[in-house]
Amino acid sequence: MISEKNSIYFSNNKNEFFALDERTGVIKWKQTLNSNLRPTYADGLVFTVTLEGYLVVIDSRNGNIVRMTNLFEQIKKYKKNNIKPEGFIVARDEIYLSLNNGKLIIIDIKTGKSKNILKIDNGKISRPYVLNNNMYIVRDNSIIKLN
C-alpha cells in the first residue's frame, strides 16, 4: 500500500488493485491484477508486478493500463511455475525486481524489457532497498550492498 497525490494504491487477495480517495475512502478506480507486492508511484504512473511476472504500468488518474510487459519471457517455461516476485523498486531509469530464486532482474523503465539478470543467491532474497545512493538486499542472515 502506498499513498501519493491524495490517493491510496493497493491490491488485495482477490486479484483486485485499487485507487482510493485518501480523504473519503471512495474508490477512484479498480483493475483486475493479482499482485501482492507494494506498488510504486512515479510521474503520474503506478507500477506493480503481478505474481506471474508481468510489469504493469497504470495511469494514476483513471486506472487505465498504459503497458503490461512479461518480465519472465527469458525464463524457461518449466522454471516459471516456481518463480515468484518478492519485491521491486523504481530507481532512475530502471526497475529492480527481486525473485524468490535469488535473482535480481534489472528492467528498462521506458520499454519494460529486461536489461540484465543478476544471481544474488541460491534462495529467496528481499525487496531491494536504497539508502544513500546504495542498493541493499537481504538474504538469509546477511545484507548485500550492490553498486
Predicted features along the sequence, with ranges:
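Solenoidal tandem-repeat scaffolds enriched in leucines and small polar residues
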Residues: 1-22
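Short loop/turn segments that connect beta-strands within beta-propeller blades
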Residues: 21-24, 60-63, 108-112, 147
